[in-house]
Amino acid sequence: MLTPSILLASLLAATAPTAETPPVKSVEPVVAKEAASKTAEPASEDTPAVLKKKVVYPTTVKVQKDVAYLGETRKEKADIYSPLNHDATKLLPGIIVIHGGGFNDGDKARGRELNICENLTLQGYVCMSINYKLRRIKEQVTWPQSVYDAKAAVRYMRKEAKNFGVDPEKIGVIGSSAGCNLSMMLATTGPTDGFDVVKDEPYQDISPKVSCAIGFYGAVDLINYHDMKMFAKTREEAPELYKKGSPINYLDAKDSPMLLVHGTADVTVPLSQSESYLKVAKEKGANCTLEIIPNAPHTFDLQPKQRDLRPLVTAFFDQHLKGKTPVAEIKAPEAK
């Protein structure tokens, strides 16, 4: 299991921002900046149909595209984001970004992931947005390969830390929907849980430990959710698989600090998933906080219309990856 960190009690007080609020550099949503991009490259062959068009990457940061983090034999790649003119000898914290899509769909370069990566990179982080094994063929079993891929991403960033200018001891993760599930698996599972030592998986001699994790609107208790195609079995047929794929069952006091963000208007993954996770986390002594966003639906990035989440997310990562003291007020004003 993973090493505990300081509690977040002071991090999430619900008041308007003050002069103490951590500064967040202004950046327009990435999806609205197509005209500002100098380059546009076609999506890879594994990209879902909705992304079979040119991907417009931000020009405010440096992007290294389609890095073979799983080895040359795997089609799933990663994009590495770093600040412009970043001196690799000056190490920055790293953040793994994991897309959603129900474990069947999604891509590292969708608008949500571009938004998250650009905003966090502008705050002084090196981000690695990954593709991982998805279920694209009927009856195909893709779990636990998705978990192995997420752990391999952490190992790869740690392995290549000097090349990317990353502090190998300061790596966090953020994921949305299915990516939230994987982010929480990274925060809660360790060597005794069966995911860390796997034959033929890369970088087995390197730790997949993360220092902290953020999860947006994810299913974290699968046995109490619905049947998942990635298992190719129903909950009735294979309840143990669903339990093993649920980070709620690995919670304990040694887990990395976790922040969940969930909207009250989510009809895809109910808010009760995050509420149940928080309840068990408290019972087990895990360091977990839940931020509820009124009227927010299932899918949003760091800048939903309901509220600017950049101060919240930045403050969490700054505390656990940069050692900054959390302030009492970090919320941006909620939209009217």
Region annotations inferred by a language model:
Residues 79, 140, 261, 271-336:
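C-terminal catalytic histidine-bearing segment of alpha/beta-hydrolase fold enzymes
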Residues 152-227, 242:
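Primarily recognizes the serine-hydrolase "nucleophile elbow" in alpha/beta-hydrolase
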Residues 254, 260-262, 266:
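Short beta-strand/loop motif that positions the catalytic acidic residue
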Residues 107-116, 128-168, 303-308:
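Catalytic nucleophile-loop/oxyanion-hole region of alpha/beta-hydrolase
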Residues 198-202, 236-250, 256:
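Active-site nucleophile elbow and catalytic-triad environment of alpha/beta-hydrolase enzymes
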Residues 221-222, 265-269:
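Acidic catalytic loop of the alpha/beta-hydrolase fold
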Residues 86-92, 98-140, 181, 193-195, ...:
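Short substrate-entry loop that stabilizes the transition state in hydrolases
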Residues 41-90:
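N-terminal cap/lid segment of alpha/beta-hydrolase-fold proteins
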